[in-house]
Amino acid sequence: MGVRGLTSYIAQRAEIYLKPHELHSTALVIDGDNLSCNLYKDVTGSYSAFGGDYDDFYRAVVQFFQVLAECNIRPYVLMDGGYEERKLRTVSTRLRNKISVIKKINPNASITLFPLHLKEVFVDAVRDCGVPVMRCVFEADDELAALARKLNCPVLSYDSDFYIHNVKYIPLITLTVKVLTKQVKDKNSSNQKDSRDLRHCEAKNVKKRTRANKIVTGIQTTGLTASTKGSSKTYKYLDCCIYRVSHLCGRGTLSPEKLPLFAALLGNDYIARSAFKNFFAAGMGKAGRSRKLKLQQKRIQVILTWLKEETAESALAKVLSRLKKNQRDSLVSQVNAAISGYSNELCHAYDYFDEHYENAFPYIEPVSEEECSDDEHSSSSDEKFSDVEEGEDQEEADNQDEEQQEENQDVDSGDEEEEEADEGLELEVEDKTLLFPQWFLDKLYPAHLPRSFVDLMHLRKYINNPQIEHFPFHDSNEVALPILNYVFALLHHVECEKIELPLEVDMDIEGSTVPYLTYLTRALRVTNVRYFKMPIEKKPAYPFDPLSPDARHLRAVFEDNAPNADTEKLFSKLDQLPEDLRLYFLAIIYWLHRSEHCDLLHLHSLILSLVVLRTIDVTIPAEREVKTFLKRFGKTLKAERAVRDKEAAEGIKRGIKPALLELSVPDRMAHVPKSDCYLTQERLLPHFHMQEIFKKKFDLYSTTVIHAFAEFQAVVYQLNGLNSLLDFPLLSPRMNQLYCGAFLYNMYDVLRNRADVRYHVENFLLPDSKLMFDFYCYLYDWCAEFIPTWKRLEVDPTAAKALQKKRLKKQRQAARKVELREAIADPNAEMVEDADPENDFFDLNNKFCALKVA
């Protein structure tokens, strides 16, 4: 949810509110959505403009949890679910902001846009590490806090909500993901670091990293750390800072029951900050004249000072007296909900982990004496606070424009308050899992279903996540809308379940009440959010029993929406593909038939990407930096290249071993030699990075090429959602082994002007591995049977045009050479050639010429 301005406020006063901490041998509750977004931001950088490099992101997640395992940290990952009704206004605002970024995107932009499959790839990596993971029904904040209180362990996140929760909180910005080693000392001295304050340089580093918004600067394991000398016992730990609510509620400042009101006054996703403008104007006076602080920072100081002199009841009464009547109930319900969440003991995650994981809780710590005496350590915070305020740098002197911008946002949001107040309050239920049937929770908790399914069930809405796409085209998810509509129909036509009256019905047809889906997406060509209602087109083709779903629903989607694909033949030939590729290639065929913007070069690029990622990254260590790759494997590359050059000089042609020829082409891929992978990776490694030309001429970057790939991602996402709802009749695609946005774009660019794509792949992209080339041909030939007739072109028109240009260029060059040769020729050359060599020549000016001997 987020409390506006509180993260920056704490970071600027890190010496007061944060304490150094050694993280090891403990449980750790992790905010999965927050961690995934911050890891992706640090790993990919500017490459988010190409639609997602899932391979790099997956490896970063795995490395992160390997570091935790080295320090004997038992993590528990909780993922967010759907949106609550009261947060839709904020969701719409964020969606509009993202649309404006997409409209102006260029590959050099520093803004990170999260790809569609980010959370699914993160969950795959977490599962592969053996870490317990669960998806909550709605936002995971309360569940995170409840689980952390039960286990008496910290929460790892980067969300200002946890500054007001009654939990131990480790801001992700303070975590150094580098394993450190320390000697075990006596118990008293080992606890000294937790009790001391941050040094000035440490606090300054926290502020610097907060401003740079950098979370993980480099993940390092013990392989890079020096071992300690001697035989004394050691332990490994991660350096970080920890926060407890007692640091903010020190003696003489706030009491815990005032924290929910404090957070509401600052503004969050559920209540507009401008709702309190009358209160700030009349009840609290000016927020100070200091130009060193942002407006929100001044507001926090004033609120803290004012709440110090008030009780929780009197403060709430004074705030309510300055609100409009139609806003009072909303604030009271929000404060009450926050108070209940502050000490909530209802924890579904604890029960789920205990039931589904063996030895789920090896670390459950009792409350220590140090935590009970935190109030004593924080009693001097008021004195330190004044010292820090006097010594603040003038590093925010340029914040006048930001203050004006905040004021403008307050004015704009004030216009929306009347609409928000008229919507009515959402029905508050203490246990929100009661809003959903048990079969749905059984599929949701293991994170098998995407979070959007909660919105489909609860709100009957779908908030489309716009991708990097061509702005003048319709949104990339439009080609997958029939699949989404079918999923919505299944969720609301469950066998043996009482059908409740829909929240929203379509009354266009007299006498019928058909539930419809509200679809939120970007409007065409303008920076705005488009709402439109999408009724269920028709009932599912087969009954839907959630406990034993019918796999034929997948076939029904193709029969209805890709009739030219010969569905019977398509599904009968799926057995010829590896199990992990079947759903992926179903998505490819659907995309080829539904998309107007894809061509066969997109298909070639997709197949090349999966062949390379699925083979090379599994066989040899994954390395994307060219210099590092050559440094690590340069000797191997040189030796193998020498062997192959010698064989080529002797006329020996490398082939496939006879034993492998007996296997099918897909089965041979498990036997690809490492030497093939090293040489192929060396050749293809530059294509995993953004082209240098984009740094000078970013207008050469083509969003039309990206748009077709974005449509494909949407098809995979929706088809995989349907597959998970049907209990996985086909294996879910592992996007980290299939899709790399930068590589796909570069492959398309390389193949764009090739008259014979297969020849170019064989001789220039995969010449070092016959097995990989055969697999590429095998997959393309499998798809060729189902390519729509209107896309079957023997020669791509772009390539044909390029070939014609080359021919004309050669003809012009030949004509120029002829003209040049004629221009410099000797005019008497013909006379010399035609002269009779028998006729002697006598030079009259040379008296000795007649003496010439014959």
Curated annotation (Swiss-Prot):
What keywords would UniProt list here? Developmental protein
Q: What is the reported tissue distribution? A: Expressed in the proliferative tissues of embryos and in the mitotically active tissue anterior to the morphogenetic furrow in eye imaginal disks.
Region described as Disordered: spans on this chain: 368-427
Q: Does the keyword Metal-binding apply?
A: no
The source's domain of life comes to: Eukaryota
Acidic residues composition bias: which ranges?
A: 388-427
Q: Which residues form a coiled coil?
A: none
Q: Name one GO biological process term.
A: larval somatic muscle development
Which InterPro entries does this chain map to?
Answer: Asteroid, PIN-like_dom_sf
Q: Where is the composition biased (Basic and acidic residues)?
A: 375-387
This protein's record includes keyword Cell inner membrane: no
Give the family this protein belongs to, as stated in its UniProt record.
Answer: Belongs to the asteroid family.
Role of this protein: May function in EGF receptor signaling. May play a role in compound eye morphogenesis.
> Could you tell me which PANTHER family the record lists for this protein?
ASTEROID PROTEIN (PTHR15665), PROTEIN ASTEROID HOMOLOG 1 (PTHR15665:SF1)
Report what the protein is called. Answer: Protein asteroid
| Annotated organism of origin | Drosophila melanogaster (Fruit fly)
Name the gene that codes for it. Answer: ast
